[in-house]
């Protein structure tokens, strides 16, 4: 059987395309596909029609948003993240105990800000930053750390 000769130029071109893609934001259609379930989860919790899944979606969104802010794509304070984390814990406990999956009125504005920030991050941050943030989230999930340590931002 004949062997093909390796052409280093082909692999080099593919690597160059990959490297370039990591520096660019994701396509708008992909950003819309990623943000739509987040908006749906926020709306469900706003209306009192949420679920465990909606709380999990917004927990992951809060963490990803924080990680991307740490990388320089957006602004959130430690206090905002801490308040959001506490609100999610209260919402989850209430939902488990009473079946009522909703945000308190005081937290809707904060989560609207988080979701809007995440939406902007998906449109502007390069793929490399999104990949890094996603890898951080994956590590938290793999470790079973339900309460990751939130870093104070300077």
Segments predicted by a language model, with ranges:
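Short, low-complexity cationic-aromatic patches
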Residues: 44-58, 96-112
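A ubiquitous short alpha-helical element
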Residues: 23-27, 73-77, 96-100
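Short hydrophobic short-linear motifs embedded
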Residues: 5-7
